């Protein structure tokens, strides 16, 4: 026991000291510098310290008319939706309705490949009949989904022939997949009622939003968002209208505000809403990541000596061990959106950035570093040479 305690103290003492949160004026100056250097038109920022929101501000504009971006402006959450989904899935695990290890096939009334998903809900789920010739779908678990190791592509419609297929044995490696998230959504929403499934994920996530006071957040479009809504800007600075998403898709349909989402991130930093065991599972290094960059999908892994040793998939996020100790992060991106969430476990400190301009990505590393110091966030892996590009 004493040896383990001494080792823990040594690791803590070896970590770089946490820097004080900069002053409001210096934060504002840093944001304006990043926006000027990248050309980004709008950016919203939240800073969390000791699990509490300490700073919240929106900068720039929300649309081509020049309407100001505000802390209550509805913005696109993009793939930060996946972390909210993972959190919700782990609550189902806590309730005994799901196991991370049980093959998802066991939660269905019939084989996955027998479902006509377009008849159930058009354009919501994957074309699972495409998997009929590959029995590996029977082995996919919730853990595989949440660690991006199902073997699916990011989305089936990105395949040359637009057919869903499994590219590697489930659980054997990391390759980012929104399609995997959609499979787990399908199982939760259409699974066996005698196992406690057949649940509406829009309602499940909304229950968390309501509990946390996130009144302007939803995984499906709400007309009351329209009066104060952010459009986007692509990498040419061209305005792109906000997509009014008509169905819940856990891979990335969340609309939110910086005020709302900072409440979720703060709750996550406080370990709130999950059992101790489920929180530990979420943050545990589950699957080592050995590629140079996150994209393209199925990229070859680097030689072992060139791989980053501390880079792992957690559940619904990426975990790492940087100069300040263990941390986690998740990004969100589309052609006109750039989001990032970075948290350091020690001190329960986080930075959350939502931008309605994809060009802001190119300044995330600088801005997060200014606020939190050197965290070790693997931005080069996250973006490669694509930061700020549509």
What are the roles of these predicted feature ranges?
Residues 287-296, 300, 323, 354-390:
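Short, gly/Ser/Thr-rich active-site loops of penicillin-recognizing serine hydrolases
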Residues 327-330, 338-357:
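Short, well-ordered beta-strand elements
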Residues 1-8:
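Sec-dependent signal peptide recognition
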Residues 21-76, 97-99, 120, 158-168, ...:
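Short, conserved catalytic-motif segment at the N-terminal edge
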Residues 36-44, 65-121, 126-143, 166-180, ...:
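Short active-site loop at a secondary-structure junction
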Residues 114-334:
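Short, surface-exposed loop or secondary-structure junction motifs
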Residues 32-40, 52, 64, 89-97, ...:
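Sec-exported extracytoplasmic/periplasmic mature domains
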Residues 13-15:
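N-terminal signal peptide c-region/cleavage motif recognized by signal peptidases
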């Amino acid at each position: 026991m004493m040896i383990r305690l001494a080792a823990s103290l040594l690791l803590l003492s070896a970590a770089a000291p946490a820097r004080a949160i900069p002053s409001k004026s210096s934060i504002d100056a840093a944001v304006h510098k990043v926006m000027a250097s990248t050309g980004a038109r709008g950016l919203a920022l939240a800073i969390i310290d000791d699990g509490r929101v300490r700073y919240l501000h929106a900068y720039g504009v929300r649309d081509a008319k020049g309407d100001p971006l505000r802390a209550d402006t509805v913005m696109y959450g993009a793939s930060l939706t996946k972390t909210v989904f993972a959190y919700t899935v782990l609550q189902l695990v806590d309730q005994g309705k799901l196991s991370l290890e049980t093959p998802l096939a066991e939660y269905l009334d019939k084989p996955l490949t027998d479902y006509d998903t377009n008849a159930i809900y058009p354009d919501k789920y994957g074309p699972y009949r495409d998997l009929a010739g590959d029995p590996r779908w029977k082995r996919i678990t919730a853990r595989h989904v949440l660690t991006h190791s199902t073997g699916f592509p990011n989305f089936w419609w990105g395949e040359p022939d637009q057919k869903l297929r499994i590219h590697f044995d489930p659980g054997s490696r990391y390759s980012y997949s929104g399609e995997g998230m959609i499979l787990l959504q399908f199982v939760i929403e259409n699974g066996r009622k005698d196992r406690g499934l057949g649940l509406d994920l829009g309602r499940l996530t909304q229950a968390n939003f309501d509990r946390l006071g996130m009144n302007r957040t939803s995984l499906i479009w709400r007309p009351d968002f329209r009066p104060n809504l952010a459009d986007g800007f692509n990498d040419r600075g061209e305005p792109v209208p906000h997509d009014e998403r008509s169905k819940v898709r856990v891979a990335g349909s969340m609309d939110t505000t910086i005020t709302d989402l900072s409440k979720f991130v703060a709750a996550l930093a406080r370990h709130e809403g999950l059992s101790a065991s489920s929180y530990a599972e979420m943050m545990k290094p589950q699957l080592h990541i050995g590629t140079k960059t996150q994209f393209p999908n199925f990229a070859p892994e680097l030689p072992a000596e060139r791989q980053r040793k501390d880079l792992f998939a957690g559940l619904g996020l990426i975990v790492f061990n940087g100069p300040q100790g263990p941390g986690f992060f998740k990004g969100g991106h589309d052609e006109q959106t750039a989001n990032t969430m970075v948290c350091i476990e020690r001190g329960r400190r986080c930075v959350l950035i939502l931008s309605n301009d994809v060009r802001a990505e190119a300044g995330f590393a600088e801005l997060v570093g200014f606020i939190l110091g050197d965290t070790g966030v693997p931005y080069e892996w996250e973006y490669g040479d694509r930061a700020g590009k549509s």
